[in-house]
C-alpha cells in the first residue's frame, strides 16, 4: 500500500473513533462507527490473499450487523424519548439492543466467534490495530451509557467472555489466536466493572492496550506467528523473546506484573458491591488464561530445542530493528504494580 493512501486511511480511522468519543448525538456516533469500519477494511486486506479477504468479509458482516442493531435501538429510543441525546435512554428494549450491538463490536461472548478468525487471517500490524484501537470507540459509548445498561445482561456476557477467552486459548499454537482469546477475556473483565465503576474500566482498557501493543510490536520485531517460531527465536533474539514471555505473563495477570492490577481492583470493587460468587468464578476462570500463558512460557524458555553451536551464536550477529517506543511500553506493561496505592482515587 502506498504511503499517502495509508496515511489517509489511518487518519480516517482515527477521525471516526474521535467522532464517536466526542459526540453526544446518536447519529454522529453511528457515522463515526461507519467511518471507522469502512476505513479499516483496506488495512485488514493489506496482505492480499484469500485468508485476508475472508477475514475482512467476516469483520464487515459482523460490524454491519452490529451497526444495524445499534441504529434500531436508537430508533426505538427516539420513539419513546423524542431525543437523539446519548444520555436519554428511557426504554429497556432499546438499552438491551444498544448493549448487544456494542458488545458485538467488541467481540464479547456470545458474539465472539469473529475475533479469533479475523485476527488469524490478517497481518500482525492489522491484528494489533484490531485488538487495540478498535476497542476504544465501543468502550467509550458503553462508558457513557453505563447508568442505563442492563447490569444482569452485561454481567452474564462478561462471565461467559472470561470463560470463553480462557477455554478457547488452551490448545492454540497460533500467537494471533492466543492474543484474540486473551482480548475476549480482557473485554469480559471490563464489561463486568463498567456498571459499577466506569473509571476503573478506563484504567483496565489503558493497561490492556499498553500490554497488547508491546506484545504485538515484539512479535513484529522477530516475525513470530506461532509458538514453534517463538521457540526457535530464543537463539536469535534472547532478549526480545524474554520480554515477550514476561509480557504474556503480565497479560495473564500474574503478580507482581502490571496485568495483575486491573484484576485485583475489579475483584475488590465487585466485592464491595456485595458480589461474591461472580468475582470468585471470574478469578477461577482467569486461571485458564494464566495456564496457557505459563505453558507457552515453559515450552519456549525452559525447554531448549536441539541446536548446534552455530545456532547458539546467532544472537551475536543478528540485526535487530530499532523500536524507540518499545522500552517505555514494556516498562509500563510490566512494572506498574507498586503504583497501585495511588489508584485508590478511583474508589
From Swiss-Prot:
<protein>
    <recommendedName>
        <fullName>NADH-ubiquinone oxidoreductase chain 2</fullName>
        <ecNumber>7.1.1.2</ecNumber>
    </recommendedName>
</protein>
<keyword id="KW-1278">Translocase</keyword>
<keyword id="KW-0472">Membrane</keyword>
<keyword id="KW-0520">NAD</keyword>
<feature type="transmembrane region" description="Helical">
    <location>
        <begin position="274"/>
        <end position="294"/>
    </location>
</feature>
<feature type="transmembrane region" description="Helical">
    <location>
        <begin position="325"/>
        <end position="345"/>
    </location>
</feature>
<dbReference type="GO" id="GO:0005743">
    <property type="term" value="C:mitochondrial inner membrane"/>
</dbReference>
<dbReference type="InterPro" id="IPR001750">
    <property type="entry name" value="ND/Mrp_TM"/>
</dbReference>
<dbReference type="InterPro" id="IPR050175">
    <property type="entry name" value="Complex_I_Subunit_2"/>
</dbReference>
<keyword id="KW-0813">Transport</keyword>
<dbReference type="Pfam" id="PF00361">
    <property type="entry name" value="Proton_antipo_M"/>
</dbReference>
<comment type="similarity">
    <text>Belongs to the complex I subunit 2 family.</text>
</comment>
<feature type="transmembrane region" description="Helical">
    <location>
        <begin position="111"/>
        <end position="131"/>
    </location>
</feature>
<keyword id="KW-0679">Respiratory chain</keyword>
<keyword id="KW-1133">Transmembrane helix</keyword>
<comment type="subunit">
    <text>Core subunit of respiratory chain NADH dehydrogenase (Complex I) which is composed of 45 different subunits. Interacts with TMEM242.</text>
</comment>
<feature type="transmembrane region" description="Helical">
    <location>
        <begin position="178"/>
        <end position="198"/>
    </location>
</feature>
<dbReference type="Pfam" id="PF06444">
    <property type="entry name" value="NADH_dehy_S2_C"/>
</dbReference>
<feature type="transmembrane region" description="Helical">
    <location>
        <begin position="3"/>
        <end position="23"/>
    </location>
</feature>
<dbReference type="GO" id="GO:0032981">
    <property type="term" value="P:mitochondrial respiratory chain complex I assembly"/>
</dbReference>
<dbReference type="GO" id="GO:0008137">
    <property type="term" value="F:NADH dehydrogenase (ubiquinone) activity"/>
</dbReference>
<keyword id="KW-0496">Mitochondrion</keyword>
<keyword id="KW-0812">Transmembrane</keyword>
<feature type="transmembrane region" description="Helical">
    <location>
        <begin position="201"/>
        <end position="221"/>
    </location>
</feature>
<feature type="transmembrane region" description="Helical">
    <location>
        <begin position="25"/>
        <end position="45"/>
    </location>
</feature>
<dbReference type="InterPro" id="IPR010933">
    <property type="entry name" value="NADH_DH_su2_C"/>
</dbReference>
<comment type="function">
    <text>Core subunit of the mitochondrial membrane respiratory chain NADH dehydrogenase (Complex I) which catalyzes electron transfer from NADH through the respiratory chain, using ubiquinone as an electron acceptor. Essential for the catalytic activity and assembly of complex I.</text>
</comment>
<keyword id="KW-0249">Electron transport</keyword>
<feature type="transmembrane region" description="Helical">
    <location>
        <begin position="66"/>
        <end position="86"/>
    </location>
</feature>
<keyword id="KW-0830">Ubiquinone</keyword>
<dbReference type="GO" id="GO:0006120">
    <property type="term" value="P:mitochondrial electron transport, NADH to ubiquinone"/>
</dbReference>
<dbReference type="GO" id="GO:0045271">
    <property type="term" value="C:respiratory chain complex I"/>
</dbReference>
<feature type="transmembrane region" description="Helical">
    <location>
        <begin position="237"/>
        <end position="257"/>
    </location>
</feature>
<dbReference type="InterPro" id="IPR003917">
    <property type="entry name" value="NADH_UbQ_OxRdtase_chain2"/>
</dbReference>
<feature type="transmembrane region" description="Helical">
    <location>
        <begin position="149"/>
        <end position="169"/>
    </location>
</feature>
<keyword id="KW-0999">Mitochondrion inner membrane</keyword>
Amino acid at each position: 500500500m502506498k504511503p499517502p493512501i495509508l496515511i489517509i486511511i489511518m487518519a480516517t480511522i482515527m477521525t471516526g473513533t474521535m467522532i464517536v468519543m466526542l459526540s453526544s448525538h446518536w447519529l454522529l456516533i453511528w457515522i463515526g462507527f461507519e467511518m471507522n469500519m469502512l476505513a479499516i477494511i483496506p488495512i485488514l486486506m493489506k496482505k492480499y490473499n484469500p485468508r485476508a479477504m475472508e477475514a475482512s468479509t467476516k469483520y464487515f458482516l459482523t460490524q454491519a450487523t452490529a451497526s444495524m442493531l445499534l441504529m434500531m435501538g436508537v430508533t426505538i429510543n427516539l420513539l419513546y424519548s423524542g431525543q437523539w441525546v446519548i444520555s436519554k435512554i428511557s426504554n429497556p428494549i432499546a438499552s438491551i439492543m444498544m448493549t448487544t450491538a456494542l458488545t458485538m463490536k467488541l467481540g464479547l461472548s456470545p458474539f465472539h466467534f469473529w475475533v479469533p478468525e479475523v485476527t488469524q487471517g490478517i497481518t500482525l500490524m492489522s491484528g494489533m490495530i484490531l485488538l487495540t484501537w478498535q476497542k476504544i470507540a465501543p468502550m467509550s459509548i458503553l462508558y457513557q451509557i453505563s447508568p442505563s445498561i442492563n447490569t444482569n445482561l452485561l454481567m452474564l456476557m462478561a462471565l461467559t467472555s472470561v470463560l470463553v477467552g480462557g477455554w478457547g486459548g488452551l490448545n492454540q499454537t497460533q500467537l494471533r489466536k492466543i492474543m484474540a482469546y486473551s482480548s475476549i477475556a480482557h473485554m469480559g473483565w471490563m464489561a463486568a466493572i463498567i456498571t459499577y465503576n466506569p473509571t476503573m474500566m478506563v484504567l483496565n482498557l489503558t493497561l490492556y492496550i499498553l500490554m497488547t501493543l508491546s506484545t504485538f510490536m515484539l512479535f513484529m520485531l522477530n516475525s513470530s506467528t506461532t509458538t514453534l517460531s517463538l521457540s526457535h527465536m530464543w537463539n536469535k533474539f534472547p532478549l526480545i523473546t524474554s520480554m515477550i514471555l514476561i509480557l504474556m505473563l503480565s497479560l495473564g495477570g500474574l503478580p507482581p506484573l502490571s496485568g495483575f492490577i486491573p484484576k485485583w481492583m475489579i475483584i475488590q470493587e465487585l466485592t464491595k458491591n456485595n458480589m461474591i460468587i461472580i468475582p470468585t468464578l471470574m478469578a477461577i476462570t482467569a486461571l485458564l488464561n494464566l495456564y496457557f500463558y505459563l505453558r507457552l512460557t515453559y515450552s519456549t524458555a525452559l525447554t531448549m530445542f536441539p541446536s548446534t553451536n552455530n545456532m547458539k551464536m546467532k544472537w551475536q550477529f543478528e540485526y535487530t530493528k530499532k523500536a524507540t517506543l518499545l522500552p517505555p511500553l514494556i516498562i509500563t506493561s510490566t512494572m506498574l504494580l507498586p503504583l497501585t496505592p495511588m489508584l485508590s482515587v478511583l474508589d
